[in-house]
């Protein structure tokens, strides 16, 4: 599976919070991918891999956790969709070598759609970066255009009428 090129994009959600650095560490994509799970079901014919039971996927500074992670491949063999489901599914990644703090995100479902360059966090979605937070039923982020939308979701366990954002003041240079 060609996960190396696409999973780091899943974690570039920091631009949704106004971060100056919307990219992951450049060395992350060159690191091996490690998948740990209680069970794995791989269907090469259908191009689907499903990992269940305390799933942890790491690549460089990036980590994804969920109860179930499903990866589907497109006809050309590239990763098409990665879906992490949990209570809550979680991801983190260091965004720059100059800033060791990791950007973090939680949701019942976190999905990366490679063909659309889109990350979707649904149901109890929350993203934290550099002290800033965004919470809502659904957060959608386009990794190519770096445009984020937060708002109402479809089937959610805890409906929210509004999004909630906290933006920290910029620190003045001394």
Label every PLM stretch briefly.
Residues 1-174:
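Mature-chain termini and adjacent capping regions
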């Amino acid at each position: 599976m060609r996960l190396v090129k696409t999973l780091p994009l899943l974690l570039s959600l920091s631009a949704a919070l106004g971060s100056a650095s919307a990219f992951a560490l450049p060395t992350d994509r060159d690191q091996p991918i490690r998948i740990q799970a209680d069970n794995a079901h791989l269907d090469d014919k259908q191009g689907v891999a499903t990992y269940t039971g305390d799933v942890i996927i790491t690549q460089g500074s990036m980590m994804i956790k969920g109860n179930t992670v499903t990866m589907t491949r497109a006809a050309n063999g590239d990763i098409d969709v990665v879906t992490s489901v949990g209570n809550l599914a979680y991801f983190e990644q260091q965004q720059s070598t100059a800033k060791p703090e990791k950007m973090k995100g939680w949701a019942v479902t976190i999905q990366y759609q490679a063909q659309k360059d889109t990350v979707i966090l649904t149901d109890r979605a929350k993203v934290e970066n550099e002290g800033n937070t965004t919470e809502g039923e659904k957060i959608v982020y386009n990794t190519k255009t770096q445009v984020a939308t937060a708002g109402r979701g479809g089937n959610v366990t805890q409906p929210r009428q509004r999004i909630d954002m906290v933006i920290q003041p910029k620190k003045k240079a001394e």
